[in-house]
């Protein structure tokens, strides 16, 4: 038994914790949870807790359903939205096969494999995500979506519900050892953003799953609804999950070069080139729903075209401003992902794409200095700028032919995502929308 496991057993006994929740996700990124009694902890650490994997989306087939949950004791935290009188704790889990091998379909395991591949190449990856979401007043229905305020970007709303909400959410996140860089009101009414500090990729994905759950829990307790839907309003900005990435070789930031353009190293340029080369192929993972493409093609600074730029928020990849004496903070920002993505899979394909650029020494295309949305199709063509997929169907088609995504996800996850996303697109394509009825449901003129 390691020191983390011993710590968990002591904490559970000293604080009289009666319920321990074991968390993991399905392939779609939906959080799953099973509660165990403290008496089961030692067995869980030693052997894992059995469950029916075939009942969880994408994990396994019905004829090989037995799987194990192995708690990661380093993720042990109390749930701050639960009563102190009846404390509840949680740990994230790795999913194992009955013989103890990592389950190939476990999203957390997919990311762990890519992180190991980066480490084998000499790199330590750090990820800093921005999480955007809308706060709506209850009750919420498709016909009734009322934002909690009418504020805009960076607005301070005196005694505003968003201010109070963010303050409570940030305090709870930090109580769970999830470091927050900053929080603020975003561009849409009732839209907020909480930025988490850079940590290793697996912890970053764990933190996103925790943050989404915590934000939803805090909202419900305040008689609000938090939605991470990429584009809930036609007339307002969509919600993204801009993802900042950096690589370290030892203690040195591999993206930093004092002599490079924008202080960006050759390694950093190759990493960006890899992201751009595979952007269309990975879109079905970073932007996994039909609604995701209404954000990407709906304006509001969402990226629609495959290019990079310095400080250019119309670009897919942005190189943020370099601050003097801040070499360790050198990073790139990939702006396509949205908060409905499975963060484990999204981070896995982003890292894999960037590493491919480094391994193949890809050349980076010229920088896009203009607002890409204002350029004509001809101008973009001359600059070598092509579009991201316009729909989930286009994204799945691009992913289907991707050797990189197939190798990164593994056969089982890859095949499941293709099937599941095709099903989602087919169901959407068969819908008759209100707009169609309003436009076409009329008596044919005589």
Name the predicted role of every residue range.
Residues 1-446:
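Glycine-rich, acidic/polar active-site loops that bind/position phosphate-bearing ligands
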């Amino acid at each position: 038994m390691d020191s983390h496991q011993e710590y968990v057993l002591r904490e559970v006994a000293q604080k009289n914790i009666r319920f321990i929740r074991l968390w993991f996700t399905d392939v779609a990124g939906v959080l799953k949870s099973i509660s165990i009694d403290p008496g089961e902890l030692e067995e869980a650490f030693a052997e894992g807790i059995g469950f029916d994997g075939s009942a969880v989306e994408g994990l396994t087939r019905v004829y090989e359903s037995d799987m194990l949950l192995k708690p990661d004791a380093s993720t042990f935290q109390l749930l701050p939205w639960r009563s102190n009188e009846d404390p509840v704790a949680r740990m994230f889990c790795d999913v194992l096969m009955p013989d103890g091998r990592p389950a190939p379909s476990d999203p957390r395991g997919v990311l762990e494999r890519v992180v190991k591949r980066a480490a084998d190449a000499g790199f330590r990856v750090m990820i800093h995500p921005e999480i955007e979401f809308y706060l709506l007043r209850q009750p919420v229905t498709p016909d009734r979506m009322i934002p909690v305020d009418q504020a805009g970007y960076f607005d301070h709303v005196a005694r505003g519900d968003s201010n109070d909400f963010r303050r409570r959410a940030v305090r709870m996140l930090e109580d769970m050892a999830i470091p927050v860089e900053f929080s603020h009101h975003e561009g849409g009414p009732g839209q907020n953003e909480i930025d988490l500090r850079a940590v290793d990729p697996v912890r970053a994905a764990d933190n996103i799953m925790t943050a989404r759950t915590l934000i939803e829990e805090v909202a419900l307790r305040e008689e609000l609804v938090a939605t991470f839907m990429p584009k809930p309003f036609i007339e307002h900005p969509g919600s993204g999950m801009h993802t900042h990435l950096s690589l370290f070789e030892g203690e040195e930031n591999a993206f930093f070069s004092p002599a490079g353009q924008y202080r960006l190293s050759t390694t950093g340029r190759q990493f960006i080139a890899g992201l751009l080369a595979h952007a269309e192929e990975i879109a079905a993972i970073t932007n996994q729903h039909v609604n995701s493409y209404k954000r990407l093609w709906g304006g509001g600074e969402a990226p629609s075209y495959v290019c990079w730029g310095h400080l250019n928020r119309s670009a897919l990849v942005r190189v943020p401003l370099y601050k003097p004496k801040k070499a360790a903070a050198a990073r790139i920002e990939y702006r396509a992902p949205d908060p409905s993505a499975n963060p484990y899979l999204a981070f896995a394909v982003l890292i894999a794409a960037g590493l491919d650029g480094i391994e193949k020494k890809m050349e980076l295309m010229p920088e896009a200095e203009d607002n890409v949305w204002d350029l004509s199709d001809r101008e973009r063509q001359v600059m070598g700028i092509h579009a991201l997929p316009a729909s989930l169907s286009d994204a799945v088609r691009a992913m289907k032919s991707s050797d990189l995504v197939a190798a990164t996800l593994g056969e089982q996850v890859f095949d499941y995502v293709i099937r599941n996303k095709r099903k989602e697109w087919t169901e959407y394509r068969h819908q008759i929308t209100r707009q169609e009825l309003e436009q076409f449901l009329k008596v044919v003129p005589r």
